[in-house]
Regions:
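Signal peptide-proximal N-terminal region
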Residues: 1-6
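Short beta->alpha junction loops
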Residues: 8-18
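Short, solvent-exposed loop/turn elements at domain surfaces
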Residues: 18, 67, 131, 138-142, ...
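Caspase-like (clan CD) cysteine peptidase catalytic core
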Residues: 19-44, 48-107
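Extracellular S/T/G-rich loop segment that most often corresponds to the catalytic His/Ser-adjacent loop
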Residues: 90-153
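Short glycine/serine- and small hydrophobic-enriched flexible loop segments
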Residues: 156-161
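Caspase-like cysteine protease fold
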Residues: 163-210
């Protein structure tokens, strides 16, 4: 089902900076979200992990990869801010990776050391679902012809109905991750690399009806 435009906060390009993202989470969302609502969050961009691998960050448009704590946003902070709204459910989509590389497999930080990521998705609250573009040690690639991330491209296709395996006019988390794994992994293989989308959450939960 569609969402009211007034209930959507779209931040792209230069608007996807740290102050505006935090403003949306801290000020805008509590006003429109309210208690017992379903919240959906989508982020496409760079991500990095802390040196000890315990904290995952998203890197806003104005972020500095060498100053994570000062200019990036912790995923755990995002979760806490979303929890404060007392939502019925939260579904998050992250088209990013935490390997320290760009979609073209260039290094975000000079002389970056390999980091073993130990952050645990299972620590998420029970009413949270998280779809991620790749495993923590993989790079999230793109489809050049579509000019967007591979995960984002197939996520949109899936939401259009292609992920509805049993054709019952609703898509479960299981159906979506199965569709993403099949298509993203196949597309990545054609680029001579590995990318496996991941799901943390209830696989039987209905993601959407149409």
């Amino acid at each position: 089902t569609g969402k009211k435009p007034s209930n959507i906060n779209l931040l792209v390009d230069k608007d996807a900076n740290r102050p505006k993202i935090l403003r949306a989470l801290k000020l805008w969302l509590p006003k429109v979200g309210g208690e017992n609502r379903d919240i959906y969050l989508f982020f496409a961009g760079h991500g990095l992990a802390s040196d000890d691998g315990k904290n995952l960050y998203i890197l806003p448009q104005d972020g500095d990869a060498s100053l994570l704590e000062d200019t990036a946003i912790k995923r755990s902070e995002i979760v806490k801010l979303l929890q404060k709204t007392n939502p019925k459910s939260v579904t998050m989509f992250f088209d990013t990776c935490y390997s320290g590389q760009t979609r073209n497999e260039e290094t975000l930080v000079a002389n970056l050391r390999p980091v073993r990521i130990v952050a645990d998705e299972q620590n998420m609250p029970n009413n949270f679902t998280v779809f991620t573009a790749s495993a923590n040690d993989q790079t999230s690639g793109s489809i050049n012809e579509a000019k967007q991330g591979m995960f984002s491209y197939y996520l949109m296709k899936g939401l259009e109905g292609k992920a509805d395996e049993n054709k019952d006019k609703q898509i479960t988390n299981h159906e979506m991750i199965a569709y993403l794994k099949t298509n993203v992994s196949k597309e990545a293989f054609m680029q001579n690399r590995e990318q496996d989308p991941m799901l943390s959450g209830d696989p039987d939960q209905v993601l959407m009806k149409y």
